Design a protein with these regions (language model features):
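Surface-exposed short loop/turn segments
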Residues: 84-135, 144-151, 155
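Bacterial N-terminal signal peptides that target proteins for export
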Residues: 1-9
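Bacterial N-terminal signal peptides
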Residues: 8-18
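Extracytoplasmic/periplasmic, Sec-exported soluble proteins
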Residues: 51-59, 112, 116-118, 152-164
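A structural "domain/chain start" motif
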Residues: 18-72, 169-178
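C-terminal partner/receptor-binding element of secreted or periplasmic proteins
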Residues: 147-178
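Short beta-strand->alpha-helix linker/helix-N-cap micro-motif
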Residues: 68-93
Length: 178
């Protein structure tokens, strides 16, 4: 009977630990209109609140590079970065475009004597022309752990950023792939 109790306790612990880890979530609010001209999708620079600039800026650049490298999968002609922040873009022009906006936040490094745990969260939104609400939303949390004797924080921060950029791009590509 003790082994059955131990197994049940172990399964409960695994379930609790699994429930605590953040997982990507996507919400489809609408289907992308198949009649839309997908020649250009604009990307508004992400708001990176409480994220080191040397971490947030490269993620955005890598995200756009991945999208453009894989755009043939999506039937999109090109992904173009808007040079202004969202609040500086003319609303009358923006409402007529297909565009992506997003945020990166919650960057945390927890270091001990021998290891570091890193976490960051991001969310992106896809908008259709004429709509004030997104047709698609993706929440992408990324966690990473490493031992100090195997790597350093700068290298692993870059690895975490690349993973986030890849996950963000994958969510968009999946939504836009016919």
């Amino acid at each position: 009977m003790k082994s059955g109790s131990c197994i049940a306790l172990l399964l409960l612990a695994v379930l609790l630990l699994t429930a605590c880890s953040a997982v990507p979530k996507t919400k489809d609010y609408s289907v992308l209109d198949p009649q839309l001209d997908l020649e250009t999708i604009y990307i508004v620079p992400f708001d990176a609140t409480l994220v080191p600039p040397d971490f947030g800026d490269p993620i955005f650049d890598q995200f756009v590079d991945i999208l453009n490298a894989r755009r043939q999968q999506t039937k999109v002609g090109r992904f173009v970065i808007l040079k202004e922040d969202l609040k500086e873009v003319e609303p009358a022009w923006l409402i007529k475009q297909i565009y992506i906006s997003g945020d990166i936040w919650g960057y945390i490094e927890t270091s001990g004597c021998c290891s570091t745990d890193m976490k960051v969260k991001s969310r992106l939104y896809l908008y259709e022309p004429g709509k004030n609400s997104p047709i698609f939303e993706a929440f992408i949390p990324v966690e990473h752990y490493f031992d100090h004797d195997r790597s350093d924080i700068a290298t692993e921060r870059m690895r975490l950023g690349k993973k986030l950029a890849q996950d963000l791009a994958e969510a968009v590509i999946k939504k836009l792939t016919p």
